Structure formats: C-alpha cells, structure tokens
Amino acid sequence: MARHRNVRGYNYDEDFEDDDLYGQSVEDDYCISPSTAAQFIYSRRDNPEEEYGYEDLKESSNSLLNHQLSEIDQARLYSCLDHMREVLGDAVPDDILTEAILKHKFDVQKALSVVLEQDGVQTLKEKSERAVCAGQPSKVISRSSQSESEIVPKVAKMTVSGKKQTMGFEVPGLPSEENGHNVRAPYKGPPGDDVSIASPNVPETGTPKSTAHPPSLQTSEELGCTPTPLRKSGKLRQQIDVKAGLEKRQGGKQLLNLVVIGHVDAGKSTLMGHMLYLLGNVNKRTMHKYEQESKKAGKASFAYAWVLDETGEERERGVTMDVGMTKFETTTKVVTLMDAPGHKDFIPNMITGAAQADVAVLVVDASRGEFEAGFETGGQTREHGLLVRSLGVTQLAVAVNKMDQVNWQQERFQEITGKLGHFLKQAGFKESDVAFIPTSGLSGENLTSRSQSSDLTKWYKGLCLLEQIDSFKPPQRSIDKPFRLCVSDVFKDQGSGFCVTGKIEAGYVQTGDRLLAMPPNETCTAKGITLHDEPVDWAAAGDHVSLTLVGMDIIKINVGCIFCGPKEPIKACTRFRARILIFNIEVPITKGFPVLLHYQTVSEPAVIKRLISVLNKSTGEVTKKKPKLLTKGQNALVELQTQRPVALELYKDFKELGRFMLRYGGSTVAAGVVTEIKE
C-alpha cells in the first residue's frame, strides 16, 4: 500500500513548472569550443591559393571544351563508350576508354582489344592507389566545389617546389553537364606555372607542349610515390599459336570425344561409372556414399551408374535421360566422355551427344534374350549404330557387357560378334575400325586392365576397354576454319552476363572476342571461357567449353544456336537442299511429308517440299528425276523447309556441321548432308 500512497500523494505541479524546451537541443544553449570548431568546421580562409587554383582549373577546362571534338565525333565517342561499358562494366575508368577510342579512331573492336590486353582491373587498382598516394600532400579541395568536380580532370600527381608547381592529369572522357562537350584536352595551368602532362598518348589539338623541368623541381621521389608506367601487353591475340598451345596444355596428349551408346539397360552407365572409379576419378568416400544410398533405394546394382546419372529422376527411374559428361585420361589421350540415354523416348538427346563425338563405344547385353531384344526390330542397338555412323563416327568399340552372367562363354561372345559385325558392316563401318571386347561393368573385369579370370583368358587375348579407347585415332581438328560453336545448354550464372555450353566444331575463341549468334543475329562478347571446370584464356576445335557472354539478352539464345565470328558468319535459312539416305521405313516418303529435323543440338519441325531426283548410291548419278515417292534404301536429292530459321553449313565446307537426321513417328527415317542453302 505504500506504493499507492506515493502515487496518490505525488505533486504533479512541479513537473509542469519548466518551460517547454524539448524542441531544441541542449547544446544550442552553449557555445562551441575553439578546439572543436577547428577540428570539425571547414574554413575557406585557410586555403586561398587552392581556391584560386581550382577556379583557374575550372575556367581553363571550360574554355577548352569547345575546341576538341565536333558534335559528330562527340556522338561517336559517347556511342563507343556506351558499347565498351556494356562489355567492361565499371572496372575501367573512362579516361582509359576515351584514350583507347581516340587512339584507334573510334574503332570499338580495336579499342576494346587494347584495354582487355592490358592487365585490366589489377593494373587500374594500382594506378588508383598510387594516384591517391600522390594526392595526399596536396590540400583538400573545398566542399562547395565537389558538386562540380565531375568536369574536372583527375589529379594523377602533384609535386610542389618553391613557387612553381608540377601537375599531371589523366584526362577523363566524361561529358560535361553544362554544354554537352567532352573534356579531352590536356590541362593548361594558370599563367606563370609550369605544367607537365602525365597522361601518355594524348593527342595535341592546338595546345602548346609542356616545358621541361629541371631535376631539382621533381620531388615525387621524396613523397615516396612514382608515376605508374604503362604496361605493355605480352603478345597480341592475333598471334596465338593454337596448335602449340594445345600440345602444351594437354601435356602432349590428344583430345578425344567419346560417346557411349546402346540399348536401354545394357549397362552403359554402370560400365563407364566403374571405369571412372577404377581410374581414380571418383574417390572412395563418394563411391561408398553411392553404395549406401542405392541400397536404401533398393537399387544396389545401380551404385556405379549413379556416378554419371546425377539427377534424382534418373536415379529413381534407373534410366539415363540426358547426356552425362565427364573427363578422364588414358596414356596418350584426354577423353571427354558422354553417356547417352538408351531409351527410345530420349533418342533426341542421344543424337545431341552423338553429334558431338569423335568415336563411340556400343554396349550390348550378353544375357540370353536381352541381346536379341535390343538387336531385333524395335531395339535401340540397330538404331544407335546407324545414327552414330550417319553422324560421322567411323571408329567403334563394341563392349559385350554382362559376360559374367553367361560364365564368359566363348560361344556366346562369337554369336554376338557375328550378328553385330555383319550389321555394322552394312551400316558403313570398316572391319578394321570395329573392335569387340568382353566386359563386366558390375565386377569391373577387363575394363582398365586385362582380366585375370581364367574363364576369359583361356580364349581372349585382346585389349581391355581402356586400352582400346587409348588406341583410337583422333580426327583432324578444323582449327584453321572460322569459329563455330553449337549451343547445348544455356543458363544464368552468378555475376554479369550468362553462360552457354557446347562443343567448338571449328576455329578457336579467346576471351574478349566478339561473337555473333545465329539465327538470332545478335552480337556479344566472350567475357570468360571455362574448360573442364577450369578458367582458360582460349579454347579450340574439339573442346567442350562454357562461355560467359555479355552484351546480349539471354532470352534471345536457345539450345541449337550457333556462335560464330562476325566477319565470317554462318548462314541461317528456312529452305535448303540435301542428299538423304532412306532407312527402313513403313510408309514411303512423298512431297509434303512432315519430319523432325535433328541437326547438332537443334530439333526443328520440317516438311519435304520437293523430291528432286533419285541418285545412285555409289556414283551419285541421277537415275530418276522428280520421283513421286521414296522408299527404303534409296538415295535421293530433296528440298526441305523448316518452320523457323536454322543455322546450317554445307557438307563440302564443314563436314561436322553438314550432317543431319530426319525422324518421324518416334523412329529415324533418313540421314542426310546439306548440299545447297536456298534462303
């Protein structure tokens, strides 16, 4: 109750006797001390000389604005600056960009190359740090002039000795807000002062040369700061030796692109996953994790397949759906491995992988009934063999898998090789380019080393699978041809720009190169190149790379686009003529027949507009003009039309980019090569 009495007996009148001064600070009633004023209040009277110098600098700069560039040249300069800003961002100061543009007479490509060849951001940081260090002895410019400092050249160095001053400026190429002109001329100091220009390669337009200074006036060494010299680029981008660089980069090993194909459930992913594990590309900890997870999912035998089947849906269904890509090395080769899907629903993805391959491994199941199911009509073994041969693969290794389930029987192996060998010969493979190897993907027999099993060694004395891959001959790379890259994936990465992945079919690319995307007909710049998850400065034909691009909207790029050089672009068309080979089809092909065109990584609906002629298979001579229909096994010249433009190359110019496949109703009906581009 004592608290209640205190509240009831409280005298509130004492609280209302004070004046209401809560609207102002208590410190307003007291004078500021002289020491505080000297520390925090700026006095203009302390810097009369600097105020005079700045005003003269401003007047001199304004007086030179109207004597540098014409309005047309200013507009060209602003356009070039905007274009280079899109590529470089804010890392490079405008004065360096302006200097490069004017030095190369408004040629954006040359100016951009010069800026990128220099050490770039690191050198610029060093310059800015040294500029700040050199500016420390000078006094602070008044705050009232900071709002107008955008039109004043940046002070690179200032050394004072006696009454004379030695100043240097890096002239920025920023537009003036007052009259729309460009500050480009060297600064001419106040009357009576000796001025030296620190910016190199500045064109002189009606400005007298600076006078030389005696050594006694230079005191920059006393301040501990020296002017940053311009650094020369190591070697020109045009002088790169790609062939020598390839040998040096790969340690003398040759590049080989390998695709693994075969019927569904033949054991492709398990076979190659176990090989990668035996080669040391997959560590034991990761492999143990896959084994435990596969056991929990009730798929213990799929542990090695999970090395390549990374997505949850692929692991859940136990079927490869997309092309898995990885890298491993043999004694003489650097191999890019592509694990293609075997299910018939994912044949388009398999074509994408096969179109990027140099050689192939065909995996067949040796189990009773399984080989027959994949090899007979409707199986994917036949179709995959035809597809890879039609797409330019000439060397093939046939891995007869799951031989342990038939106790390594020589009779079963010979039965399979007899049937497959006859078919592959009809498909166009040479007997010398086809090798048959008995393997077991689950147990790892005869993969990386020759088998020690007595059941196998008593009748097989040949190579293991890894030795056969190492014996493949890599194709001749089209490094000297114009640059071509087929986009297989597009994604947004961290930072500016976006990324595209694909195989370089011809030529080479370097960071900073201008690229043209077809058929969107949009240009961009290669900001970065990644090869096997490692950043590189360049990449050449045969490499599977990821390019970081800037200067283009990601919406305009799709899977199937082709990047090329702006000077030697690829043609985009909707109508073209081609020579096609008809496969086993149930319905004859007639005029107006709808097909699905598979070309590299693109899949586009098309229509056969004209049947021009039937050709002889061996000689190519015309045997019949204007046929009404085409049946299986015929070789014909036709004209196709696509719904949207497709970037194509003639087969005679680019064999890698001149092949395509035609599918209808879930099956491959024809393979062809481009002979003429109409429009």
Swiss-Prot record:
It catalyses: GTP + H2O = GDP + phosphate + H(+). Residues 198-210 have a biased composition (Polar residues). Its EC number is 3.6.5.-. The keyword Lipid metabolism does not apply. Gene3D superfamilies: DNA helicase RuvA subunit, C-terminal domain, P-loop containing nucleotide triphosphate hydrolases, Translation factors. GO terms for biological process: nuclear-transcribed mRNA catabolic process, no-go decay; regulation of translation; rescue of stalled ribosome; ribosome disassembly; translation. The modification N6-acetyllysine is found at K617. Residues 339-342 are annotated as: G3. GO terms for molecular function: GTP binding; GTPase activity; translation elongation factor activity. The modification Phosphothreonine is found at T226. It comes from the Eukaryota. Residues 262-269 are annotated as: G1. Residues 401-404 are annotated as: G4. The modification Phosphoserine is found at S63, S113, S145, S147. Transmembrane segments: none annotated. Residues 440-442 are annotated as: G5. It is an enzyme of class 3 (hydrolase). Keywords: Acetylation, Cytoplasm, Elongation factor, GTP-binding, Hydrolase, Nucleotide-binding, Phosphoprotein, Protein biosynthesis, Translation regulation. It is found in: Cytoplasm. Residues 253-477 form the tr-type G domain. GTP binds at residues 262-269, 401-404, 440-442. PANTHER family: TRANSLATION FACTOR (PTHR23115). GTPase component of the Pelota-HBS1L complex, a complex that recognizes stalled ribosomes and triggers the No-Go Decay (NGD) pathway. The Pelota-HBS1L complex recognizes ribosomes stalled at the 3' end of an mRNA and engages stalled ribosomes by destabilizing mRNA in the mRNA channel. Following mRNA extraction from stalled ribosomes by the SKI complex, the Pelota-HBS1L complex promotes recruitment of ABCE1, which drives the disassembly of stalled ribosomes, followed by degradation of damaged mRNAs as part of the NGD pathway. Belongs to the TRAFAC class translation factor GTPase superfamily. Classic translation factor GTPase family. This is HBS1-like protein. It comes from Rattus norvegicus (Rat). The gene is Hbs1l.
